[in-house]
Amino acid sequence: MEGWQRAFVLHSRPWSETSLMLDVFTEESGRVRLVAKGARSKRSTLKGALQPFTPLLLRFGGRGEVKTLRSAEAVSLALPLSGITLYSGLYINELLSRVLEYETRFSELFFDYLHCIQSLAGATGTPEPALRRFELALLGHLGYGVNFTHCAGSGEPVDDTMTYRYREEKGFIASVVIDNKTFTGRQLKALNAREFPDADTLRAAKRFTRMALKPYLGGKPLKSRELFRQFMPKRTVKTHYE
């Protein structure tokens, strides 16, 4: 653990008069809680580097639940997020903070996170495809296995024109019932490919990931959604989060 690790800060808060308490996501150790001693002091060179969306190299150690930051270096400048992409980045940071246990390795998820942040930084349109892909990747890493390509009842491949209702712990079963848990075969194929060519498949992906993530998040609302509603135009909030 004393070696250098690639990492991102998910969240930070003041700790004592001159230090910071950090929630970081690392390549090798997963999510880790760190104390950055003296990081808030006037002479500290760390303050500017220990920010969300800045690619970092960190070295830390300690035996308790809270580790001590030994060294930190910014690999590059913070990825340029602003407006809707900034709130999207804050959303995925909060998502990781809520669903990942401390010190559980998720090396592949780390690169999914990096790819998502890079996609948000380069987005020229809606950030939603990048968010949905990351949510689906996160669910996969958490062990949430779902077969999007075959009917769980018959075993037959899904048909674009048929509808399938999701049943927890079973999968998608052909159904004539139309409700919030019902998806078309076309939508399921889009979820499986993680490609969303139109508004219909994007809405379906959001509906599924919200439903699938709910048990992990519990009843506590996400703060990033509330911030988004407060500071972004109402039309943007409606299309992005509702």
From Swiss-Prot:
SUPFAM superfamilies: ArfGap/RecO-like zinc finger, Nucleic acid-binding proteins. Disulfide bonds: none annotated. Monomer. GO terms for biological process: DNA recombination; double-strand break repair. Coiled coil: none annotated. Pfam families: RecO_C (PF02565), RecO_N (PF11967). Keywords: DNA damage, DNA recombination, DNA repair. This is DNA repair protein RecO. Belongs to the RecO family. It comes from the Bacteria. One of its GO terms (cellular component) is bacterial nucleoid. The lineage of its organism: Bacteria, Pseudomonadati, Pseudomonadota, Gammaproteobacteria, Enterobacterales. Involved in DNA repair and RecF pathway recombination. It comes from Escherichia coli O139:H28 (strain E24377A / ETEC).
